[in-house]
Regions:
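Extracytosolic ligand-binding ectodomains
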Residues: 2-7, 11-21, 29-419
């Protein structure tokens, strides 16, 4: 396909020669001296946006999963076999579905991983279900994926929208910024944003906040001046962003240029988008699943290796792709299988995985959500910022150490998932 952007895939003559050379080098990593046929590698289909409004996040995703792939192979692979991650640009839901099917049919992928776009993740999950192959949805956050659109073959790693709202909401409640306050929201006009708005409305209603206006924003919008003029007219107490990808970056830059006096917070932010906004532009409280200053031994070691390899700190999508491939390698070794039914049953057992945080994580059997800590963060004063990567101050993990991890996740009563 002419639109294909890939770091693995079709076995043309040049690729075959390269793979043959890689097989010869495998002996140095602990594999038998006899050169293995490429079909003996465990092939994993990996889809993520590498272009478009989520492209910057996808770039970090590829760096993270490739780093994990290298480490796993250097340690002997999985069940004595090398793994090969085939990464491609998902582009949009239709293309993502087509490529997912091709990875299974032509490339011989054992299962599928990846994605950041909730819309594309939904499309891939449908391919996975039809083919009865496991899909590890790594970076998509829509509650819908874990709710009414859940299926037996999809497992979700990233924190869902409800958890992001709860993470930021706990900080807003602490600072008396909800009850009786008037909110205006800007929402990404696709499944993720619509889903996030529902979670935000539920939070406002439960805690006495008043939503006085919302604007749906197309994912290709770059000029936010019409929306900022409406905010100026509405004169809210708080502005809340339900945007995604470079939408957030563009909003933050233009919000600072307009000089609006209303505090801005957000229920979704990825750190690459925060970094791109530039020093002095971002403000308020935002949620994250991980940040490179997290003070745990495992996280610090990962950051050190990533910086040494790439010359910059890892963004949260690099971290989450890295730990996702590591936990799948652990699952395959423990289950002694690459079969999707076997792996799914293993993940449903509640096995705890080290994801480089203070508390270990596990998949919940009834909705396939990885249960883990989340964090709010705020923006450092400009005088305290050391470099462009040092803008954010990570808050305390939620839930508190003495609370169950599931306390910030939707309950069975709140979640319509039926596997």
């Amino acid at each position: 396909m002419t639109d294909r952007k890939s770091t693995g895939g079709a076995l043309d003559r040049r690729t075959t020669l390269k793979l043959g050379a890689a097989g010869l080098g495998a002996a140095a990593f602990g594999f038998p001296a006899i050169v293995r046929a490429q079909t003996d590698a465990i092939r994993i289909g990996h889809l993520t946006p590498m272009t478009g409004f989520l492209g910057a996040l996808g770039g970090y995703a590829v760096l993270g999963i490739k780093m994990a792939e290298e480490e796993i192979n250097q340690a002997g692979g999985v069940m004595g076999r090398p793994i090969q991650v085939i990464s491609e640009d998902s582009i949009n839901p239709d293309t993502a579905a087509t490529k997912a099917q091709r990875m299974l049919d032509r490339d011989g992928a054992a299962f599928l991983m990846g994605e950041i776009s909730s819309a594309s993740a939904l499309a891939i999950s449908q391919v996975a279900a039809r083919n009865k192959r496991l899909f590890l949805s790594i970076g998509a956050r829509s509650d819908t994926l874990r709710g009414k659109s859940c299926n037996k073959y999809m497992f979700c790693v990233d924190i869902p929208n409800t958890v992001m709202v709860n993470a930021v909401g706990s900080a807003l409640l602490r600072d008396n910024m909800v009850k009786g306050k008037r909110f205006v929201t800007l929402t990404a006009d696709y499944v993720f944003g619509h889903d996030l708005l529902r979670a935000a409305k539920a939070f406002f209603a439960a805690h006495g906040g008043n939503l006085v206006g919302d604007e749906l924003v197309a994912t290709d919008v770059t000029d936010f001046s019409p929306y900022l003029l409406k905010i100026r007219q509405a004169r809210p107490d708080v502005v809340c962003s339900n945007l995604a990808g470079n939408q957030v970056t563009n909003l933050i830059k233009q919000y600072a240029e307009f000089g609006l006096p209303y505090p801005i917070v957000g229920f979704n932010l990825n750190t690459a988008d925060a970094w791109a906004a530039g020093e002095g532009n971002l403000s308020g409280t935002w949620p994250t699943v991980w940040y490179h200053t997290l003070d745990t031994p495992g996280s610090k070691a990962f950051v050190e290796k990533f910086v040494k390899k790439n010359g910059k700190p890892p963004e949260n999508h690099a971290w989450i792709q890295y730990i996702s491939l590591k936990l799948m390698a652990e699952a395959m070794n423990a289950a002694k299988s690459t079969d999707s039914e076997t792996l799914g049953a293993y993940l449903e057992k509640g096995t705890q995985f080290d994801i480089l945080k203070a508390r270990k994580a596990y998949f919940r059997a009834w909705d396939h959500q990885l249960i883990q800590e989340a964090y709010p963060f705020t923006v450092k004063p400009k005088a305290q910022i050391k470099d462009k990567w040092d803008m954010l101050q990570l808050g305390a993990a939620v839930p508190n150490p003495d609370q169950p991890l599931e306390s910030i996740y939707p309950t069975r009563e709140q979640n319509p998932c039926s596997l």
